[in-house]
């Protein structure tokens, strides 16, 4: 279905205007009567600073009346002066799409950073697109097996769904995203798109080099809007990455994984732009259009007939406050939430997933099966009972518990440790090989632990391992030492 927005993407008119006002990254431009550019159109202006000429891209954000538009700059406006000539490109910001983007790093405007000029001669799509029509959506629900025990068992991911990684600073969100990129490339030979929203330059460089070293870069496109760039760039980079992913889904009929790190910085950039445009702030200082902006992004991330975009989004939680409007608005769109807990990380258990607060809408017998559901509920029940007993243990000690409660606590400790796992991307730090555990093995292992088959094994035998074979090997090593 052809929409007005898509028709606008292909327009090729070029209208000249002039700069009348510059306030930081916000630029007011006057156009001749009848030549007003459409909202979201890209404008270009030549800027000379210290004898160096460059082209700055602006995006139309508001129509002010009297042939004036207010635009947001996608680059620093140093050197931009009143009266400078501005050209309307007649279309939104466009990015290269297709196989050409794999293995390369782009900015929000679609410029290749590691190989300048790459992709500009090929097909390009505008970053503002309509979501798929209702009759094109896929109705079937399917599990995305990750090989990570705690996720597959307790918070299974939906193929074509949206998954949020929640947590404060330093609990492992980016590491888990890197691990998922590696697993998708290795196990499914799938295409991944990574959108770094407000990324630190160091983090982006490290990610690029690590992926190159691990041999998964050729199946991944990376798009960065770095922390030091204007808010307009950080607000649009997620849409640029999503547009590349949509091409793989809609044209090449591929299942794609879209990683967004960090969706909070997308909200934060929107808040900055909203303030610069003079909008009245809403709750906690966020933009009044927060829910709308989030919806525009999230509604495009979905499954269509036979192909999908599965999105994994890191969500920074300010001051670990889950009632903050930014994470709270994100919650509404997610199919699964994986909460990374500082308390679990402090025990040295990674991934530091909190199994009691993480959720998945597909953890239902009709979708995952009766046995999977029952084992998951037994594991959650044991961990919940252990949590309830912690106050008694802290005050009176383990000796005051009944025999049944003592067994529950001991099993919970084994389960908690066994939910940890070695990651492929962490091999160089831990010195231990990463592990992929099939879902069937995970269900079997936790069922046996819940049944008490390993009650005589010491807790150390379950530390951050893969499957039960690793537990047996660790137990054998421990008994030999004795």
Swiss-Prot record:
Keywords: ATP synthesis, ATP-binding, Cell membrane, CF(1), Hydrogen ion transport, Ion transport, Membrane, Nucleotide-binding, Translocase, Transport
Residues that bind ATP: 167-174
Domain of life: Bacteria
Cell location: Cell membrane
InterPro entries the UniProt entry points to: AAA+_ATPase, ATP-synt_VA_C, ATP_synth_F1_bsu, ATPase_a/bsu_AS, ATPase_alpha/beta_chains, ATPase_F1/V1/A1_a/bsu_N, ATPase_F1/V1/A1_a/bsu_N_sf, ATPase_F1/V1/A1_a/bsu_nucl-bd
Membrane topology: Peripheral membrane protein
EC number: 7.1.2.2
Transport is among the record's keywords: yes
Keyword Cytoplasm: no
Reaction(s) catalysed by this chain's protein: ATP + H2O + 4 H(+)(in) = ADP + phosphate + 5 H(+)(out)
Residues spanning the signal sequence: none
Pfam families in the cross-refs: ATP-synt_ab, ATP-synt_ab_N, ATP-synt_VA_C
One Gene Ontology term, aspect cellular component: plasma membrane
Record-level Gene Ontology MF annotations: ATP binding; ATP hydrolysis activity; proton-transporting ATP synthase activity, rotational mechanism
Family designation: Belongs to the ATPase alpha/beta chains family.
HAMAP family, alphabetized: ATP_synth_beta_bact
Subunit comment: F-type ATPases have 2 components, CF(1) - the catalytic core - and CF(0) - the membrane proton channel. CF(1) has five subunits: alpha(3), beta(3), gamma(1), delta(1), epsilon(1). CF(0) has three main subunits: a(1), b(2) and c(9-12). The alpha and beta chains form an alternating ring which encloses part of the gamma chain. CF(1) is attached to CF(0) by a central stalk formed by the gamma and epsilon chains, while a peripheral stalk is formed by the delta and b chains.
Function in brief: Produces ATP from ADP in the presence of a proton gradient across the membrane. The catalytic sites are hosted primarily by the beta subunits.
Protein name: ATP synthase subunit beta
Organism from which the protein derives: Corynebacterium aurimucosum (strain ATCC 700975 / DSM 44827 / CIP 107346 / CN-1)
């Amino acid at each position: 279905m052809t929409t007005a927005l898509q028709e606008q993407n292909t327009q090729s008119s070029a209208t000249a205007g002039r700069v009348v006002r510059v306030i930081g990254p916000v630029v007011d431009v006057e156009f001749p009567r009848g030549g007003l550019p459409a909202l979201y159109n890209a404008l270009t202006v030549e800027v000379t600073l210290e004898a160096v000429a460059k082209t700055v891209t602006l995006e139309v954000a508001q129509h002010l009346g009297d042939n004036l538009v207010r635009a947001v700059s996608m680059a620093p406006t140093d050197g931009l002066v009143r009266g400078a000539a501005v050209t309307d490109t007649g279309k939104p910001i466009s990015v290269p799409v297709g196989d050409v983007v794999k293995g390369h790093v782009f900015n929000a405007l679609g410029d290749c950073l590691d190989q300048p000029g790459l992709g500009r001669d090929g097909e390009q799509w505008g970053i503002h697109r309509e979501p798929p029509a209702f009759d094109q959506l896929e109705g079937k629900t399917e599990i995305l097996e990750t090989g990570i025990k705690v996720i597959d068992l307790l918070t299974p991911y939906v193929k074509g769904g949206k998954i949020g990684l929640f947590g404060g600073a330093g609990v492992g969100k980016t590491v888990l995203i890197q691990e998922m990129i590696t697993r998708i490339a290795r196990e499914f030979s799938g295409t991944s798109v990574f959108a770094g929203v407000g990324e630190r330059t160091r983090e982006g460089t490290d990610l690029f080099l690590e992926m190159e070293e691990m041999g998964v870069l050729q199946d991944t496109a990376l798009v960065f809007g770095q922390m030091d760039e204007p808010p307009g760039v950080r607000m649009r980079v997620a849409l640029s990455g999503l547009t590349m992913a949509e091409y793989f889904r809609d044209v090449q009929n591929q299942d794609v994984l879209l990683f967004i790190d960090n969706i909070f910085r997308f909200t934060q950039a929107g808040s900055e732009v909203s303030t610069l445009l003079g909008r009245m702030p809403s709750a906690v200082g966020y933009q009044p259009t927060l829910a709308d902006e989030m919806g525009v992004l999230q509604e495009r991330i979905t499954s269509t007939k036979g192909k999908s975009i599965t999105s994994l989004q890191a969500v920074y939680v300010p001051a670990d406050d889950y009632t903050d409007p930014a994470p709270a608005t994100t919650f509404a769109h997610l199919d699964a939430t994986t909460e990374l807990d500082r308390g679990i990380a402090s025990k040295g258990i990674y991934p530091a997933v909190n199994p009691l607060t993480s959720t998945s809408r597909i953890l239902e017998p009709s979708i995952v099966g009766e046995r999977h559901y029952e084992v998951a509920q037994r594991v959650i029940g044991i961990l919940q009972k252990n949590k309830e007993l912690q106050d008694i243990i802290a005050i009176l000690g383990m000796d005051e518990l009944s025999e049944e409660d003592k067994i529950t606590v001991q099993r919970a400790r084994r389960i908690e440790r066994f939910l940890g796992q070695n990651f492929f991307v962490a091999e160089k730090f831990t010195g231990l090989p990463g592990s992929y555990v099939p879902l069937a093995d995970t269900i079997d292992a936790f069922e046996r632990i819940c049944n008490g088959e390993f009650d005589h094994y010491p807790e150390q035998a379950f530390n951050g391992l893969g499957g039960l074979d690793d537990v047996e090997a660790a137990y054998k090593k421990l008994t030999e030492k004795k």
